[in-house]
Amino acid sequence: MSKKYDAGVKEYRDTYWTPEYVPLDTDLLACFKCTGQEGVPREEVAAAVAAESSTGTWSTVWSELLTDLEFYKGRCYRIEDVPGDKESFYAFIAYPLDLFEEGSITNVLTSLVGNVFGFKALRHLRLEDIRFPMAFIKTCGGPPNGIVVERDRLNKYGRPLLGCTIKPKLGLSGKNYGRVVYECLRGGLDLTKDDENINSQPFQRWRERFEFVAEAVKLAQQETGEVKGHYLNCTATTPEEMYERAEFAKELDMPIIMHDYITGGFTANTGLANWCRKNGMLLHIHRAMHAVIDRHPKHGIHFRVLAKCLRLSGGDQLHTGTVVGKLEGDRQTTLGYIDNLRESFVPEDRTRGNFFDQDWGSMPGVFAVASGGIHVWHMPALLAIFGDDSCLQFGGGTHGHPWGSAAGAAANRVALEACVKARNAGREIEKESRDILMEAAKHSPELAIALETWKEIKFEFDTVDKLDVQ
């Protein structure tokens, strides 16, 4: 063995920098934005990322002789400049598929965004995008139902779904919570939602909430003749408790449940998605904690990666920001990951932040959810940006109506239907937004009051995380 094995430390680029490599269709491809320490060559930084996220360690080890390192190692095959940023660069790395457990997003992320992010040779590291090969996609369950099945279940066609989060999000008793749900649904909303941080607190235990919400949903359905629903948050302390809540929602004949997929974790999320698929339940996904991970432009994980991972792990709806509301997200970037939630094939398009072609095959799509600081004046822009296969959720923009939640719901429903009608008639709804809404308000006092209430409310702040394009 001593004749074959050279102990010691060698540069990462000697093994993991392979610019001559042509990625295979079965490779998982990743794009990292790297910012190395001063004096460390780009090739060494990029190769270190490839090594530490695949087979490498800081020293040569004798046990490399027991496997085929050339087959299993990650390979950095390309380096690119980041437009407008002289200290950072893009490293493109190819990973052989056998490095990952089939269908396990947890395992993929453990490798790609694990210890390598604490590597001292790096000042910053950000996972910008992943190309999942079809051979991996076919091992994932994906959305439990998908867009088409969800529309059939809810009997909603030709427009976005309309919803809201119940406010105040914390502090209501179960009975009062149910009353607010009822007011919103009878006013014209399709769906209402638990806030992401309501689980089972002393002021309102989960079982009490589920029962009062179910009563409210059924009463609103009887009065309106429409299918209604409420996202019952099943996120819990343990997986066992999560499944107990999901089972009870099914017993109550509720159509949809909810999970906080980042705080709850991908293992729990995939398990819950599999349960929903077997039990005919829709699954709404909230992204609480995402901004801790994705907002810094040089370090962390871009949300487009988290969105792709969610589509594979499983969910029928996912929050994506609003572009026009109170939360971070520019238009082109948001459209980029909406494409990856809904389309069967998404081409490389740097203007939308997509670094790779992504073929999703026959995997069902996910509804994009716009929620956060939106009101009736935003309706034309939201419809133009998100299209029909989306869910528009107005929390404060429903409950803040001077006449109450039912009137706020009615105002949003009238505004949405007016915008859809105008779009279908060929009008440019963003340019003509004021005229469209004011015309509709002539026949809806609820909308007229809403337009007056929120006419001065805007969230005009510069985007922190911008696309790296010139």
UniProtKB/Swiss-Prot annotation:
Its cofactor is Mg(2+). The record marks 326 as: Transition state stabilizer. It catalyses: 2 (2R)-3-phosphoglycerate + 2 H(+) = D-ribulose 1,5-bisphosphate + CO2 + H2O; D-ribulose 1,5-bisphosphate + O2 = 2-phosphoglycolate + (2R)-3-phosphoglycerate + 2 H(+). Heterohexadecamer of 8 large chains and 8 small chains. Keywords: Bacterial microcompartment, Calvin cycle, Carbon dioxide fixation, Carboxysome, Lyase, Magnesium, Metal-binding, Monooxygenase, Oxidoreductase, Photorespiration, Photosynthesis. Transmembrane segments: none annotated. InterPro entries: RuBisCO (IPR033966), RuBisCO_lsu_C (IPR000685), RuBisCO_lsu_C_sf (IPR036376), RuBisCO_lsu_fd_N (IPR017443), RuBisCO_lsu_N_sf (IPR036422), RuBisCO_lsuI (IPR020888). Its EC number is 4.1.1.39. GO terms for molecular function: magnesium ion binding; monooxygenase activity; ribulose-bisphosphate carboxylase activity. HAMAP family: RuBisCO_L_type1. Substrate binds at residues 115, 165, 169, 287, 319, 371. The active site is at residues 167, 286. GO terms for biological process: photorespiration; reductive pentose-phosphate cycle. This is Ribulose bisphosphate carboxylase large chain. The keyword Lyase applies. The basic functional RuBisCO is composed of a large chain homodimer in a 'head-to-tail' conformation. In form I RuBisCO this homodimer is arranged in a barrel-like tetramer with the small subunits forming a tetrameric 'cap' on each end of the 'barrel'. Mg(2+) binds at residues 193, 195-196. Its main location: other. Binds 1 Mg(2+) ion per subunit. Pfam families: RuBisCO_large, RuBisCO_large_N. GO terms for cellular component: carboxysome. PANTHER family: RIBULOSE BISPHOSPHATE CARBOXYLASE, RIBULOSE BISPHOSPHATE CARBOXYLASE LARGE CHAIN.
